[in-house]
C-alpha cells in the first residue's frame, strides 16, 4: 500500500525546482516513453517533430506549488502562451495558432471555440501529458498550432491507495486560502484491474501584492470562491495475451459557490463609470458560472490482429458551460443606462469513434492507418434577469425573467481516413510522410436575431423573421512529410512539413442579420449572414520546422525553428462578439527551445526554456506586424 500526503502553505507562489525538458526515457525505469498522441506509438527520439512529454513527477511538483493545469503547461512548454488566472484558457495558443486538447485520445475541442478544454481534469488524475508542437495533419481540423494529449492514471494489479491533502494562502485575509483533498484506490489481478479516484478543490479569495482583493472575472469567469470536483474511474480487462478492453468514465464539475459575486454599486454606478465595483458574498442568482462534463471512453486493443496492432475507441462527452451575469448598456453617450443583465449557457453533446492499425509490412517500413468519425451537437441560450431587482440590489439579486437563444444551434459531422508511414533508409536516416482526407458537414438551425428575441420577450414586438439555416460541407486533404537524422545515439535533427485546417466558430459567424422597422409588431429581415449565401471559408495552414534534440544522462535539450503560413485569418467584433474573415495572409515564425540539467548525486535539476515569436499579416504587398 502506498499513501502519499501533502500539506503546503505558501505566502506566495514558489517554484521548488526549475522546469525541465521532458526526457525520452522514463525517470524511474530508463525505458523509452511512448508517445501515443502520434497514433503510431513512437518514442520521442523517433519523431521528426518537436515533442514534449511531461511526466507525473513534474505535474505534481507544479501542482503542489499551487498552479492550475493551464499554468503548468505554459510554464513547461516553450511554444505555449500564457493565459489569465481564470476558468478558461482563452487566448492560449501554441506557436501563435490554435491547439487541440485531448484526454486519452478523446478531443475536448468543439466547433464552438469555448476555450475551456483545460478546465477538464484535476492534476491528481493525470499520469503524463504528451505535446506535439506545430500543425498536426494526422488529427485534422483545429490542430494548426499543436496537440496536447492528457493521459490519465490507470489502475495496477497490486493494491494501491493514494491520498493528497494540500492548501495554500497568501495570509492577506480570512478568505485568502485554497484547499484540496484527493484520494484514489486501485488494484485487481493479472486479468482485471482498475482505479477509482475523487479529487476536490476549493478556491477562496484572491489578493494582490498590496492586499487588495482581486475582482471576480465576469467575462470568461474566474476561479475565486469556487469548487471543483473530479470523479474518475477506469478499468482494464485482459482478454488474453494480445487483447485488452479498457473503460474510463469521468464526472467533472467546476462551479462558483453561488454566494460570491460583484457588487456593481447603487443603480449600477460601477458599470456607468460613477462608482467602483467590489466583491460581495450576497449573490443570489438563478444562473451560476461553471463547467460540468460527463465523459466515457471505451478502448479495445489487439497487439496481433493478422500481424498488426489495432486500437479502436468509442467515446461520448457532454458538457454544459455557464457564464457570469453581465450587464449591457443602452442609450447614447454620455447618457448610457444599463438596459439588461444576463448570462449565457452553452451545451455540447459529442460522440465518435476511431480505429487505428499499426503494421510492419517490411523490416524498415511502419504503416499507421485508420479512420475517425465524430458527431457534435451544440445549443446556447441567454438567461435575462429581472432588471429592477438587479438594480435595487447592486446587481446581486438576479431572478430569471426570460430566456432567449444566444447563438444558432448546429450539428457537425466529421469523417476521415488517414495513412502515415515511416521508412528507415539506414540507421542514420528515417523518412516519414502521411495524408489525411477529412469530410466535414455543418448543419445550422434557423435563428431569430438576438436583439429581436429580446424585444419579443419584453412585449415590444410580436414576431421577427428568422435568419435561415442550412447546411454545407468541406473536403480537405492534408499532408505531412519529414526526415529524421540520427546523428548519434543521443542526438537527432529533423526537418518537418505539416498542414493544418480549421473552420472558424460557426456559432459566431452565422445567425446575424439586419432588420427593418417593425410592421404591425413584426420585424422583417432585410439581409443576413447565413450558411446558404455566405459559406464560411476554412483556414489552411502550412507549417515548416527544423529541429535538434540531445538526450544525455544529465543534460537534455531541444531546439526548433518554425514557420507557418495561413491563406486567411479572422477577427472578433468586440461589440457583438461575432467573427469576420479576412483574406489577408498571416505568417508566424520563431525559435523555441528548452534545456534541463540534472545535478549529479542530488534530487535537484536546473533548466530554462524560451520562445521567440513574431506574427505578421500581409496587407497588399507588405508584411505588417500582426496581433
Spell out what each predicted region is.
Residues 121-164:
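A beta-strand signature from Gram-negative outer-membrane beta-barrel systems
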Residues 174-203, 212-260, 292-303, 361, ...:
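Transmembrane beta-barrel wall of Gram-negative outer-membrane proteins
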Residues 299-303, 307-327, 486, 492-498, ...:
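Membrane-embedded beta-barrel scaffold of Gram-negative outer-membrane proteins
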Residues 31-64:
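N-terminal periplasmic "start-of-domain" segments of outer-membrane beta-barrel proteins
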Residues 36, 70-107, 127:
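Extracytoplasmic beta-strand/coil segments of soluble accessory domains associated
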Residues 164, 424-431, 440, 551-570, ...:
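Gram-negative outer-membrane beta-barrel transporters
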Amino acid at each position: 500500500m502506498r499513501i502519499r500526503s501533502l500539506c503546503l502553505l505558501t505566502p506566495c507562489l514558489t517554484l521548488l525546482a526549475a522546469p525541465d525538458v521532458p526526457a525520452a526515457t522514463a525517470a524511474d525505469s530508463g525505458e523509452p516513453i511512448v508517445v501515443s498522441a502520434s497514433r503510431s506509438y513512437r518514442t520521442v527520439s523517433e519523431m521528426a517533430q518537436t515533442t514534449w512529454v511531461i511526466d507525473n513527477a513534474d505535474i505534481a511538483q507544479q501542482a503542489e506549488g499551487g498552479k492550475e493545469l493551464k499554468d503548468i503547461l505554459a510554464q513547461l512548454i516553450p511554444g505555449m502562451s500564457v493565459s489569465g488566472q481564470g476558468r478558461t484558457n482563452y487566448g492560449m495558443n501554441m506557436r501563435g495558432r490554435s491547439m487541440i486538447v485531448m484526454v486519452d485520445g478523446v478531443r475536448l475541442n468543439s466547433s464552438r471555440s469555448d476555450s475551456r478544454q483545460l478546465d477538464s481534469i484535476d492534476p491528481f488524475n493525470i499520469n503524463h501529458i504528451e505535446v506535439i508542437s506545430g500543425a498536426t495533419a494526422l488529427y485534422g481540423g483545429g490542430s494548426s498550432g499543436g496537440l496536447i494529449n492528457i493521459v490519465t492514471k490507470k489502475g495496477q494489479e497490486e493494491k494501491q491507495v493514494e491520498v493528497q491533502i494540500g492548501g495554500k494562502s497568501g495570509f492577506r485575509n480570512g478568505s485568502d486560502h485554497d484547499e484540496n483533498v484527493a484520494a484514489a484506490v486501485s488494484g485487481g489481478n493479472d486479468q482485471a484491474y482498475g482505479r477509482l479516484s475523487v479529487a476536490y478543490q476549493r478556491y477562496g479569495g484572491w489578493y494582490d501584492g498590496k492586499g487588495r482583493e482581486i475582482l471576480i472575472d465576469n467575462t470568461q469567469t474566474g476561479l475565486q470562491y469556487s469548487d471543483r470536483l473530479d470523479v474518475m474511474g477506469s478499468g482494464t480487462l485482459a482478454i488474453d495475451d494480445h487483447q485488452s478492453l479498457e473503460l474510463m468514465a469521468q464526472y467533472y464539475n467546476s462551479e462558483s459557490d453561488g454566494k460570491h459575486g460583484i457588487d456593481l454599486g447603487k443603480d449600477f454606478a460601477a458599470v456607468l463609470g460613477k462608482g467602483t465595483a467590489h466583491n460581495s458574498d450576497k449573490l443570489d442568482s438563478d444562473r451560476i458560472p461553471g463547467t460540468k462534463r460527463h465523459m466515457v471512453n471505451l478502448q479495445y486493443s489487439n497487439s496481433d490482429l493478422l500481424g498488426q496492432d489495432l486500437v479502436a475507441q468509442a467515446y461520448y462527452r457532454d458538457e454544459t458551460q455557464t457564464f457570469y451575469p453581465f450587464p449591457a448598456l443602452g442609450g447614447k453617450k454620455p447618457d448610457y443606462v444599463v438596459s439588461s443583465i444576463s448570462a449565457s449557457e452553452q451545451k455540447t453533446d459529442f460522440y465518435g469513434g476511431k480505429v487505428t492499425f499499426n503494421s510492419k509490412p517490411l523490416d524498415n517500413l511502419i504503416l499507421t492507418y485508420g479512420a475517425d468519425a465524430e458527431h457534435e451537437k451544440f445549443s446556447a441560450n441567454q438567461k435575462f434577469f429581472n432588471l429592477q431587482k438587479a438594480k435595487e440590489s447592486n446587481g446581486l439579486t438576479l431572478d430569471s425573467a426570460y430566456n432567449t437563444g444566444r447563438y444558432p444551434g448546429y450539428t457537425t459531422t466529421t469523417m476521415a481516413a488517414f495513412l502515415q508511414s515511416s521508412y528507415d533508409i539506414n540507421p542514420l536516416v528515417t523518412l516519414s510522410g502521411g495524408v489525411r482526407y477529412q469530410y466535414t458537414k455543418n448543419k445550422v438551425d434557423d435563428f431569430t436575431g438576438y436583439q429581436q428575441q429580446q424585444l419579443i420577450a419584453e412585449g415590444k414586438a410580436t414576431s421577427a423573421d428568422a435568419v435561415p439555416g442550412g447546411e454545407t460541407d468541406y473536403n480537405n486533404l492534408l499532408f505531412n512529410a519529414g526526415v529524421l537524422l540520427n546523428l548519434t545515439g543521443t542526438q537527432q535533427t529533423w526537418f518537418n512539413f505539416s498542414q493544418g485546417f480549421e473552420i472558424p466558430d460557426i456559432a459566431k459567424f452565422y445567425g446575424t442579420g439586419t432588420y427593418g422597422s417593425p410592421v404591425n409588431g413584426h420585424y422583417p429581415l432585410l439581409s443576413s449572414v447565413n450558411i446558404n449565401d455566405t459559406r464560411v471559408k476554412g483556414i489552411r495552414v502550412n507549417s515548416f520546422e527544423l529541429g535538434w534534440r540531445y538526450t544525455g544522462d544529465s543534460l537534455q535539450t531541444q531546439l526548433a525553428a518554425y514557420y507557418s503560413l495561413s491563406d486567411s485569418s479572422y477577427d472578433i467584433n468586440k461589440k457583438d462578439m461575432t467573427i469576420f474573415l479576412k483574406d489577408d495572409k498571416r505568417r508566424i515564425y520563431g525559435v523555441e527551445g528548452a534545456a534541463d540539467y540534472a545535478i549529479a548525486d542530488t534530487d535537484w535539476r536546473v533548466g530554462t526554456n524560451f520562445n521567440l515569436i513574431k506574427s505578421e499579416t500581409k496587407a497588399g504587398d507588405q508584411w505588417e506586424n500582426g496581433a
